From Swiss-Prot:
UniProt modified residues of type N5-methylglutamine: Q237
Protein's name according to its UniProt entry: Peptide chain release factor 1
InterPro entries: PCRF, Pep_chain_release_fac_I, Pep_chain_release_fac_I_sf, Prokaryotic/Mito_RF, RF-1
Segments of this protein annotated with the region Disordered: 286-305
Post-translational modification: Methylated by PrmC. Methylation increases the termination efficiency of RF1.
Keywords from the UniProt entry: Cytoplasm, Methylation, Protein biosynthesis
Originating species: Shewanella amazonensis (strain ATCC BAA-1098 / SB2B)
Length: 363
């Protein structure tokens, strides 16, 4: 391992010991904000410290085994050769793991997320598929022990959603869902199709990280147009008699957010504002990413419908991720929320891209 990397790891080990000492300090324990921040830092350091200690142990084992080679006893020599082989394999594995642990972290990975699903081409069938996607993400959320809260929903006339926006909250929500942004295409025979022909329809998914109030982009109230209207259900019928639904338009960008899920106008406005802030922040993030990564592919999609990331083929029971040429014949399990088989490979691919970029920077 490079000397510069070793020095960085030694610095993290020292910092870990400092944080541990601070966490037992009475003045820190009484300051809840400081205690919480240090506890979070300690948790973030835990894996890399554990990995580096294992690496140091493997280095020590290798040195001990090399010393054993100097012995005259043939049995000891043979044992030493086995130890050397084992220690070298451990060092190789631990070095690869530590490189990944040292990669720059996306600070938003720990954030909650808004998931926006919109029916695209395909009419009723696209709306039904949008409903299927929402169910798939909700089932996945159950396996992760996340909470799901619908912020806004525009139901399709024959089921599903023309558009649904939901807030997913829990541990590492954005970090796990951020690669879901983009165009999702479905190929299947609709229930209304008498000839048994396969139809293709599409939905777009956009995953936006929730922005804490302290970090929110500043929005000038004069740049907002706020309209109230009566909430409507599937087929357009009005579901309540008061104008509790809210539509907020951000005039400089033309961004529009509607929220009509709550009966309280105040609650709908608060929800719509949180989604608007997330969208404006996502636009800023996208601009920054484009400027930073012109030479590097970006696996985190923008939610653009032209950017097709995945195809769900029901007749063949197949799901394909076009970004990494991955095809799985386990569509039923995926639609029931078993998404790790799709999420983990793309996270690994993203890490490989980051490692390659880091190697280029280091020359």
């Amino acid at each position: 391992m490079k000397e510069s990397v070793i020095r960085k790891l030694e610095g993290l080990l020292e910092r870990n010991e400092e944080v541990l000492a601070l966490l037992s300090d009475a003045s820190i324990i009484s300051d809840q904000d400081r205690f919480r921040a240090l506890s979070k830092e300690y948790a973030q350091l835990e894996d890399v410290v554990k990995g580096f200690k294992a690496y140091q142990q493997a280095v020590a084992d290798l040195e001990t085994a090399k010393e054993m080679l100097e012995e005259d006893d043939p049995e000891l020599k043979e044992m030493a050769q086995e130890e050397i082989k084992s220690a070298k394999a451990s060092l190789e594995r631990l070095e690869a793991e530590l490189q990944i642990l040292l990669l720059p972290k996306d600070p938003n990975d720990e954030a909650n997320a808004f998931v926006e699903i919109r029916a695209g081409a395909g009419g009723d069938e696209a709306a039904i598929f949008a409903g299927d996607l929402f169910r798939m993400y909700s089932r996945y959320a159950e396996t992760q022990r996340w909470q799901v809260e619908i912020m806004s929903a525009n139901e399709g006339e024959h089921g599903g959603y023309k558009e649904v926006i939901a807030r997913f909250s829990g541990e590492r929500v954005y970090g796990k869902l951020k690669f879901e942004s983009g165009g999702h295409r479905v190929q299947r025979v609709p229930e209304t199709e008498s000839q048994g022909r396969v139809h293709t329809s599409a939905c777009t998914v956009a995953v936006l990280h929730e922005v804490p109030e302290a970090e929110a982009v500043e929005i000038n109230p004069s740049e907002l147009r706020i309209d109230t209207f009566r909430a409507s259900g599937a087929g357009g019928q009005h579901v309540n008699k008061t104008d509790s639904a809210i539509r907020i338009t951000h005039l400089p960008t033309g961004t529009v957010v509607e929220c009509q899920d709550e009966r309280s106008q105040h609650k709908n406005k608060a929800r719509a504002m949180s989604v608007l802030v997330a969208r404006l922040q996502a636009a800023e993030d996208e601009k920054r990413r484009s400027a930073e990564a012109t030479t590097r592919r970006n696996l985190v999609g923008s939610g653009d419908r032209s950017e097709r990331i995945r195809t769900y083929n029901f007749p063949q029971g197949r799901v394909s991720d076009h970004r990494i040429n991955l095809t799985l014949y386990r569509l039923n399990e995926v639609m029931e929320g078993d998404l790790n088989a799709l999420i983990e490979p793309i996270v690994q691919e993203h890490q490989a891209d980051l490692l390659a970029a880091l190697a280029d920077e280091q020359g």
